[in-house]
Amino acid sequence: MSNIYIQEPPTNGKVLLKTTAGDIDIELWSKEAPKACRNFIQLCLEAYYDNTIFHRVVPGFIVQGGDPTGTGSGGESIYGAPFKDEFHSRLRFNRRGLVAMANAGSHDNGSQFFFTLGRADELNNKHTIFGKVTGDTVYNMLRLSEVDIDDEERPHNPHKIKSCEVLFNPFDDIIPREIKRPKKEKPEEEVKKLKPKGTKNFSLLSFGEEAEEEEEEVNRVSQSMKGKSKSSHDLLKDDPHLSSVPVVESEKGDAAGDLDDGGEGESAEHDEYIDGDEKNLMRERIAKKLKKDTSANVKSTGEGEVEKKSVNRSEELRKEARQLKRELLAAKQKKVENAAKPAEKRSEEEEATPDGAVAEYRREKQKYEALRKQQSKKGTSREDQTLALLNQFKSKLTQAIAETPENDIPETEVEDDEGWMSHVLQFEDKSRKVKDASMQDSDTFEIYDPRNPVNKRRREESKKLMREKKERR
């Protein structure tokens, strides 16, 4: 791979494509393909490729884009016509990450370009290579091909170029053109005029008269309240749950305060003027307060009944809990009484049992339980006790071996607890009865040393014999 990079000529120019798959750095061969590089850089400066999609994806082969129409048949060069191919002997389709011009034939280059996803020797001398993808951005380029495609090699959710940035421009004389892009036409749904509202035919309904009256009332209220904020006070005038007292004090009260400050004569006239209105308002307030008090009393009585029911329920639950506690305590007491029975009664019951095996089992069990209780559970005392048992076993073993001499060991197997201590382990002798007379020992090996003088004399004698035989012949 390093050999390939050495063969390629140095680059002169750099462009950054910002795509939905990530940024892609492209270095350009502006000396080897000047027309293609100038075309590509100027289109990037003119934002020609912005928001264009990669309309063709062939997995393992190429990813093609650069068509503003997104169909694969659009796009034009900066020269106003297709420009010629530019081939170079050191630029080959021998790896991934190369950028080349797409065309429909020879000398038919426009604005479309493609990235190679692998080796493509069949494209040599057919498409102009003008750049390469550099750095880790090659992995973003490979992500462009990770889409689902249809039978015509078109992706279902294509990636697109968000914007282009020219990092190094080798052509100082490029002047971007002002391209007038056609405005996008509005969709047909927005162009369509709104349909006129249909009239309601209430005669078709069984309750048509009532519905028609309600509709007229709603229309009348909506027309009267048009352009104003509406609340429940505006629509529900006869609702007893709504208060007639305004949240914000009326301006009359403020005016009354101002008149009081003005003088006594004016205040007296004002009091006489508003006396009748205030009385009416007070009467209405008192009547409504009485209604609220009665409704509050009804609610309080209902809440009191609910509280009584909840109290009764809680008392019942407490009683049940107390009863359960008593039952648990009684069960515990019975267990303690059963465990505290005298040992004499248990021994009498055991003696009364006719089965001797069961009685023996119980005696053994009691014996080992007593021994277990005597043992300490943990600590240094438990360790000392274990070492004492080990020493006791060792002394018992040595005593059994010393008491039984080798000649007095019986051949029969001993099944008692101490018989195995004096037993001697003996293996069967599998030696051969007939031995080779020439072999001193079966475990010895013959070692031949050529430096041994005996072996030297033997070799000389054998050589003499061989010479004599040859002379006789």
Curated annotation (Swiss-Prot):
Q: Which UniProt keywords apply?
A: Acetylation, Coiled coil, Nucleus, Phosphoprotein
Disordered: annotated span: 177-386, 399-473
Q: Which domain of life is it from?
A: Eukaryota
Q: Which residues form the PPIase cyclophilin-type domain?
A: 11-166
| Modified residue annotations for N-acetylserine | S2
Composition bias of kind Acidic residues appears in 257-266, 405-419
Any one of the GO CC terms: catalytic step 2 spliceosome
Where does this protein chiefly localize?
nucleus
Question: Any keyword Nucleus?
Answer: yes
Q: Which GO terms describe its biological process?
A: protein folding
Gene Ontology MF terms: peptidyl-prolyl cis-trans isomerase activity
The record's SUPFAM superfamilies line, in alphabetical order, gives: Cyclophilin-like (SSF50891)
Q: According to the UniProt entry, which residues carry Phosphoserine?
A: S347
CDD domains named in the record: CWC27_CTD, cyclophilin_CeCYP16-like
Gene3D superfamilies membership:
Cyclophilin-like
Where are the annotated coiled coils located?
A: 206-230, 305-378
Its subcellular locations are: Nucleus
> Biased composition, Basic and acidic residues: where in the chain?
177-193, 231-241, 267-287, 305-348, 360-372, 426-438, 458-473
Q: Name one Pfam family in it.
A: Pro_isomerase
What function does this protein fulfil?
Answer: As part of the spliceosome, plays a role in pre-mRNA splicing. Probable inactive PPIase with no peptidyl-prolyl cis-trans isomerase activity. As a component of the minor spliceosome, involved in the splicing of U12-type introns in pre-mRNAs.
Assembly mode? Part of the activated spliceosome B/catalytic step 1 spliceosome, one of the forms of the spliceosome which has a well-formed active site but still cannot catalyze the branching reaction and is composed at least of 52 proteins, the U2, U5 and U6 snRNAs and the pre-mRNA. Recruited during early steps of activated spliceosome B maturation, it is probably one of the first proteins released from this complex as he matures to the spliceosome C complex. Component of the minor spliceosome, which splices U12-type introns.
The family classification in the record reads:
Belongs to the cyclophilin-type PPIase family.
What PANTHER family does the entry give? PEPTIDYL-PROLYL CIS-TRANS ISOMERASE-RELATED, SPLICEOSOME-ASSOCIATED PROTEIN CWC27 HOMOLOG
**What's the protein here called?**
Spliceosome-associated protein CWC27 homolog
Its lineage reads: Eukaryota, Metazoa, Chordata, Craniata, Vertebrata
Q: Which gene encodes it?
A: CWC27
